[in-house]
Design a protein with these regions (language model features):
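Active-site helical microenvironments for divalent-metal-assisted chemistry
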Residues: 1-171
Length: 171
């Protein structure tokens, strides 16, 4: 956790982070609610650090997926549903697979980003009580608990997976 105070020195941009940050800057100029770009960059840093060398079936780095989910969520919330255009939810989208797929824990997320983000990321995790549940069950849980704001993140997660499914079927 040595990165908490010096992540900025280690932060590197990439095409995926540039695309997301550019979208957020544009939305911040057009909406009354502003997303904290520095906090988003910190989340990008941790997503890239902890997803590390994981690769998607498309050959892209795995961290491209959560950054694209965050992009889709930002685009929707910034243009259509301003009440959910918030820093904590953009960060949740960026970190949505970290507890499930990396060594980044809920406690670590809480120390870095606070309990709201940590709880949201945990709610998006498909491992419940050491049992992996289906994507459908995960959606149903979020729906029945009326966690609409993070349900949108899960839906954009599924949308991005569907958009990129051709890689897993043909490659």
């Amino acid at each position: 956790m040595e990165d908490i105070n010096n992540w900025e020195q280690k932060f590197e941009t990439c095409i995926y982070s540039d695309r997301l940050v550019t979208k957020l800057i544009d939305l911040n100029e057009r909406t009354s609610d502003k997303v904290n770009i520095e906090e988003v960059k910190k989340a990008i840093y941790y997503a890239r650090k902890y997803h590390g060398s994981q690769i998607r079936k498309s050959g892209e780095p795995y961290y491209s997926h959560p950054l694209e989910v965050a992009f889709l969520f930002a685009e929707y919330s910034g243009n259509e549903n301003h009440i959910i255009y918030r820093t904590d939810l953009i960060i949740t989208a960026i970190l949505h697979d970290t507890i499930e797929d990396t060594d980044l824990t809920k406690d670590m997320i809480e120390k870095i980003f606070g309990s709201l983000v940590a709880n949201n990321v945990e709610d998006l995790t498909r491992v419940k009580l050491d049992i992996k549940i289906s994507a459908g069950e995960s959606l149903n849980i979020l729906f029945t608990q009326y966690k609409k704001d993070i349900l949108y993140i899960k839906l954009f997660d599924r949308l991005h997976n569907v958009r990129t499914i051709s890689y897993s079927k043909t490659h």
